[in-house]
UniProtKB/Swiss-Prot annotation:
The keyword Cell inner membrane does not apply. GO terms for biological process: proteolysis. Residues 29-223 form a propeptide. Gene3D superfamilies: 3.10.170.10, 3.10.450.40, 3.10.450.490, Neutral Protease Domain 2. Thermolabile. Ca(2+) 1 binds at residues 276, 278. GO terms for cellular component: extracellular region. Binds 4 Ca(2+) ions per subunit. This is Bacillolysin. It comes from Brevibacillus brevis. Ca(2+) 4 binds at residues 404-405, 411. The keyword Transmembrane helix does not apply. Belongs to the peptidase M4 family. The gene is npr.
Amino acid sequence: MKKSYLATSLTLSIAVGVSGFTSVPAFAKTKIDYHKQWDTPQYIGEVWEPEGAKGDDVVWSYLEKYKDEFRIQGNVEDHFEIVNEARNKETDTKHYRLQEVYNGIPIYGFQQTVHIDADGNVTSFLGQFIPDLDSNKQLKKKPKLNEQKAVKQAIKDVEGEVGEKPDFIQDPEAKLYIYVHEDESYLAYAVELNFLDPEPGRWMYFIDAHSGDVINKYNMLDHVTATGKGVLGDTKQFETTKQGSTYMLKDTTRGKGIETYTANNRTSLPGTLMTDSDNYWTDGAAVDAHAHAQKTYDYFRNVHNRNSYDGNGAVIRSTVHYSTRYNNAFWNGSQMVYGDGDGTTFLPLSGGLDVVAHELTHAVTERTAGLVYQNESGALNESMSDIFGAMVDNDDWLMGEDIYTPGRSGDALRSLQDPAAYGDPDHYSKRYTGSQDNGGVHTNSGINNKAAYLLAEGGTHYGVRVNGIGRTDTAKIYYHALTHYLTPYSNFSAMRRAAVLSATDLFGANSRQVQAVNAAYDAVGVK
């Protein structure tokens, strides 16, 4: 029977027993939110006792319980794979990340999270599940294209985007998925094209495995758009390495290293490792890239116990002096790249601590929630980078103010405190719904940015009063949500759920932090 909906979802309540524990949501009923399009659960909140199941079997038993709601025929283990299990030592909770599969093929971006409290009870499910794929006969057929032909199709198309064949950083590869786009499911190859010439790009292509048509494409490259001395003349201290009589911008004390290179105004990466004879560095762009990468590493390590962007100490590599008068900084999937700016729109972009932290947070997001860089999930991707940029550079709530329009005092790229001051929405009712900027990823980030600001600082917005909880607790909530709850296609509603669940995990179901999260998202119109 088809369910009826209000707004984007319907909440179904099923009576269950009440848990007396405050470490998990105090649900008197099971709450299920259904996805508007697929009519399957996108959120389940409850306290469910597994009755003797242990380890992964808890997850499988839980999914078995809801197989009818997911419209699953047969074994649930044929429809999901457990791709990650993480234990939070602070809360003694477990967090499982799942991947939906069909005939052994992963459905691109369709991941789910299942969460287990300290007593072994399942407390929530969050994510998207697409049902009834058996009805699409094309998904059962063998691909007519092989991986090599799919790559060729993508390269041919991107040549039209950039004007010539790019010089790829690494050889492009194709991976087979089931890809859902505009209400249709396709057997498709995902092809990532990463290049620097003739212009930097990190394009994601989805090629129909039968026809060779381009189903969807978008550029994932994030644009900022808009002792030694740094770009602003400030003196910084940072770790280097000495080899013989030469000093190198190479820090071996953090993870597997932090290294800073120069492209010498060319476009080859990583370029040349920065060196000096007396360990007093005068290249401001290099000093800032190195020192700011160290500070960002220290923040995530000391505050969130994360060892580099991948959690395993990966080398943080930065290149400055990229190209000539280049007004951009970006994470290309393996390293940071900074232009020198043109002196009018931008100073050297590594001079902004919040810019460096913003870009490195993209690397963290890529290794955790994997938020797809389009539409609402892309706006959340951008917002997470803004939020942690403001947490690392914590003297204000502006982004890029140190390096943007140096001739104009008080200017910035964005504001978390007042997104509207820079043309960005501060309420869901004002969101951008067009196709520019990958569906408004830099614009609509203002909605979640405003919620984060209100959560930290408090205030009244659209008639809703929020009692702030401070930057520290706010950062803990968003980091927990990013690493444990959000999935590739999470939207704003899922962000609210993830933040509430994270605040519950960290501070308790009846805490002022949970109340503040709910108020903050009420204030920006996210239900």
